[in-house]
Structure formats: structure tokens, C-alpha cells
Amino acid sequence: MSTNILQHVKQLLHNRDVFSFFHNKTGNLNYLDNTTQKPEVFVSPNSTIVSAPTLDSFQALMEKGNFTTLQLAKVGIRMFFSYSVSKYAVLCFSTAIILNRLTVMSSLRSNSTNIRLPLWSKTLLHLVATLSLVKALLQILSQFGLMHELHVSDTDFYALSVYLFVALSDCIEIFISSTTNVPSLICSDFSIWGLSLNLYIISKMPAGQQHIGDNVELLGAVFHRLVIHLVELFHIRAYRLCGEVILNAGFFTAFVTRTYLNGLDFINICLIHNYFPGFFYISTILLASIGIFLKALFTSNPFRSLYSRYKNLEKWWRSNNYNGEEEFNEIALSLCLLLTSNDYKIFKKSDNVKSVDEVAAFSNSYVVSGHLNQLQSTPEDLLSRKEMTTDSQLPGFARTYLGLFELVRTIILTYSRLLKNLLWSKNFESSIDKKPRVGKRKKRDLNKYVTEKNYKKFLYKPDVKELNIESDLRSLELLLPEDDSSKDYFPPRKIDESVSDEEFDSDMESQLIIDEEKELTHLSSNAVDSDDLEEIAWNISMWSILNYEMDVHNKVNGPLTRSQYGKRNPQGVLVDVVIERLLHHTNSRYMYKRLNMKDDDKLEFKFDFAFDSCDEVEEMDLSCLICKVNKRNIVTWPCRCLALCDDCRISLGYKGFATCVSCDSEVKGYSKLNIV
């Protein structure tokens, strides 16, 4: 093959017959006549044939042999401006605006109500998109000569129809996904802009002189979108990755086979741009897998080595939270990094790609705790999957229509088995001799024999002295034993009614109040400055952090951050915040009020919060659960608990506390209420 390339290069340099070289190796379906002295068509740098009036300066440049980078840049700029004023660029711009409006439409509607699309509408829309893509697929296959009855001689009409079918499928997918609040299945390998540029180049070609690489690119774009709508139609989104793996493996096999048989004559620059990443990932995965198998064969226990690799793959899949709806290139890239790493490091999705449902997507800064992430409206995207009912709960297309055959099959099998059992039982009874059936003997109910006259014999113990033990058999059937060996019954001592549980509880409560009053009196008499309070709170917080980090069981890799400490030791963080708020409110004299103060009187305290439970309070207690002073005005999401004030929320947030103080669930955001 290298010898042939050298011969062509020598011929090119000797004769400068550039067009004969390109026309014979561009992979056209119909080759030009070799006797043509001045061909009417030429090729672009990506081996794609376009019409002469578009780039005639490039033809003159190649004929003169003055091929420089500057002249090539001028031709590229002229080609770009020619595409920019074409109808394909206008269609691409219009499609992008429509897709953007459909995406933003979900954020403009009210968050209080959930929109549910009926099953028939979703099925109808996906069916329309599927039929449109099938029509586009048949037109593309007709360009390869597979279906002559569908062949279109007008290349402009062919390119426009394919583009409109693909754009319609994208609009339907974006509309349904944005309406039902589910992630959209997009095909980023074949964008609308690249598709429009490719179709613009095809529209400038005469019929029968299209480059095979351009049509292969269209084939891949239609196939990938067809897989998306099929999995949506049958409600099997988790199998989207399987379909893309089959498509990429099929294209890879076809390209390798054609390259081996006919060389690289069918490849152009657009084909390399769209297919090369996927092919590179597949080649890397195959080579790495072969190396792993060969390494396992030369080990003492090959099955154990392969099993450990399988466990690594399983851990990699779980750690990245893959569900089968991702694109092939995303999964393949992560798998290549895993297979080619020497330290078996699990590359997570969060290392390179941020998930759209993370808390960081709602703000531009890194959120240490959800208590610092303010949300202005009801966050439906933070609610759990069980609470969200945006999608239709009706059965899918397959279960609705194809399930009818399963129902008919079940009914036929049930009645056939019943008829078979009836016929078999009749034949069996007629063929065997009739034998007398022995009925089961019913047990006698002894209670029927007990009457008003003889009940004493059953319920009373006869006098043993009057009975002859040897002759009278009734002595053996006595209901009660002769001697009672059980312990005697002693009634308990009477409880002193003067002492009750209520008085005991009231005594404990009064003692608690007295102790609290003493502590608060001591604190009020020794009030300190705010700076000293902050230093005390800081010392207490640092002491708890150092005490936690010095424990052998709490070692972490690297420095201990606030978020890590908040997740690992939430109880310690909560205690620190309670102490901090208690010191603040005690020093500011918020927790109590002095009433009727005189020189000879004792201190009388009136607490702002009740010591009793909420059931015993006449009105609802809206005091904060942490400081017990301020009113609750913070709602945490997605648990919807109203338990904190704004000051305690700030303290918990900056200390990395990530759970709710009421229900102990993860907090992803908060909203502030104005309670009157």
C-alpha cells in the first residue's frame, strides 16, 4: 500500500495532474470519464466534490500549482461566507432558536402544578418522529443504490428533506423531556450545525457524484436519533446505551472491513471528526481488554484476577451513578481511563463532568452546606423521585398494546388446562373400579353432653374419701389435683395515694427551673464582651474539631474540610452551634426578663419559651429548635421542615452541617418565610 502511495505522489509531482488523482480516490459512486480534459467539478480539502462556480479560484490555484496556506485560508473564508448566506444556515439558526425556547419553556411555567402528558400524546409524538427518521433513512440508503425506487435525483430536495426530518425529531424529544421534567436524550456527536454544513456541501453536488463519507455521516446521525425515539416509545430509556454500543460497534466493524478491502478512499474530514473519538475509544478498550486477559492467563489464579477486574468495573459503574441513559462517548472515555490506569483508580463522573441535578448547578459558588443555598421558589428538581409525579403513571406503549396478546394467551392457556382436567378426571373415573370411599370420622363434641343435670360431675371435684380408688375409675379422671402445691397469694401493699406521679413530675420540673435560674443568674452577673464570646465559641468549636481528628477511627485522607467534618460528625457540629447560640442569647439577655426588681426581692424570671411539650401549650410553639428564642422562619428542602431561625441557619451552614435538625435528612437548599 505504501508503494502505491509513493507512485501516486511521483505521478502527481511529475504531471501536476491533481484532479485525476483526487477523482479516482474520492470514493465516488460513479467515477468520471478519464477522457475529460477539463473537468467541471473539483474537490475540497476534505475530499468532498462541490460544483465549480462555488470555488473556482481554488481550481485555478490548483492548476497553477501555487498552493499556499494563505490562498487556502482565503478559499475557506469564501466557502464559509457562502454557507452563511445559504438557506441551510438560516434553517440551522431557526432550529437552534426553537430548541432553546422549548428548553426554557419548562422554567417559565409555574412550579406549583405538575404537567403530565397523556400516554397517547407521548406515543403519537414519538411515533411521528420515528416514522420521519425511517423516511430519512430510506432516502439515505437509496443514495447507496440499495433502493432504486426511492432514489432522488434532485440533491437539494434530498438534503432539505433529511434535515427537516432530523430537526423535527430533535424538537419532539426536547419538547417531551422539558415538559415532563426528565433529562433529554441528545445526540451530541452529530450536531445540527455540522449536519446542516454537510447537507449544504451535498446540495452543491450533481446527482451520482456524492462522496460516500458524507452519506455515512448522515446515516450515523439518523441511526442514533432513531435509537433515542425507540427507547422513548417503548419506555426503556435504560437501554439507550446498549443501542449506541451496538451502533458504534457496527460502524467500527464496517469501517475496518472497508478499509481492509478498498483502502481509505471513503474517508473525509467530517467523517473523521464525528467517528474518530468513538473508534479510538473502542480500539483502546479492545487492546486493554486483550492485555488484561493475557496478563490473567500468566498468573497463578486467572479466574481470581478476572473476578477482581469485574468487581472494579461494578464499583466504577455504581460510583458514577450510571443508569444506561448516557451517551456512548461519555461511558467509553471513563472506561478507557479505568482500564489504562495502573493504580486501579475509579474515575468518577464528578471528577470531570458536573451533574445537572447537583446543588452547585443552582449557584455559581461552591456550597459547603445546603443551609447556605437559598431558593426563591418551590424546588421541584430537589424533591425525591417518589414525590415527583410529573410523568404519566399509565402503562407504556408495549404494555398497553402488546400486553393484549399476553392477556389472550393467558386466557387460552387457563381454559385449556381447565378443560383438560375435566376430561381427564371423567376418563379416569370411568376406567377404574369404583371403590367404597371411607368417610372421615367426625370428632365428637363433648360440650354437647354437658347438661344442667350432670354439669356438676364435670366441674366439681368429688370427695376422694368417698371413692374407692381401686374400683372407681372416676378418681383417675379428676379435673383438679388432690394437693395444691402452688404458692399462696399475698396481696400487694397499698400505694400511698398522697404521692402521685404528677406531683413527682412537678417536683422534677420545678427543680429543673430552679437550676436553670441559678445558671442564668450566674451568667448574667458575669456577662462578658461580644469579642470574648466569639473567642469562647471559637475555642469550643476548635476543641471539638481537634478532639474528633485526634481519634484514630476518624482519620481522613488529606486535610479535614468543613463539609467532611459536617458529614462525619453532625452531632458535634450541632452541639457547638447550640453552645454558641446559647452564649450569644444569654449574654444579650434574650432568654429571660427580670420583672418586679427590688433591692430586697429575689430575681424572678420569665422565660420566652415553654418548658412543657407542644401538646400542653395552648398555642403552637414556633421557637427555633436550636436557640429556643427566635421564631422559625427557615424551610429546608427537600424535607420541608420549618425548624430553624435565620441566625442558627447561618451558624449551621458555615460549620458544614448538611442535615436537617428535625428529620435528619440531607438539606439541599432553604427558603425564608415571613411568619406573622
Curated annotation (Swiss-Prot):
GO biological processes: cellular response to amino acid stimulus; proteasome-mediated ubiquitin-dependent protein catabolic process; protein ubiquitination; ubiquitin-dependent protein catabolic process
Glycosylation sites: N24, N34, N46, N66
Topology within the bilayer: Multi-pass membrane protein
Listed Pfam families: zf-C3HC4_3 (PF13920)
InterPro entries tied to this protein: Znf_RING/FYVE/PHD
Job description of the protein: Part of the nuclear inner membrane (INM)-specific branch of the ER-associated degradation (ERAD) pathway, required for the elimination of misfolded proteins in the INM, a specialized ER subdomain. Required for ERG11 degradation. Negative regulator of SPS-sensor signaling. Together with ASI2 and ASI3, prevents the unprocessed precursor forms of STP1 and STP2 that escape cytoplasmic anchoring from inducing SPS-sensor-regulated genes in the absence of inducing signals.
SUBUNIT field: Component of the Asi complex, which contains ASI1, ASI2 and ASI3. Interacts directly with ASI1.
This protein's name: Probable ERAD-associated E3 ubiquitin-protein ligase ASI1
Source organism of this protein record: Saccharomyces cerevisiae (strain ATCC 204508 / S288c)
Gene this protein is translated from: ASI3
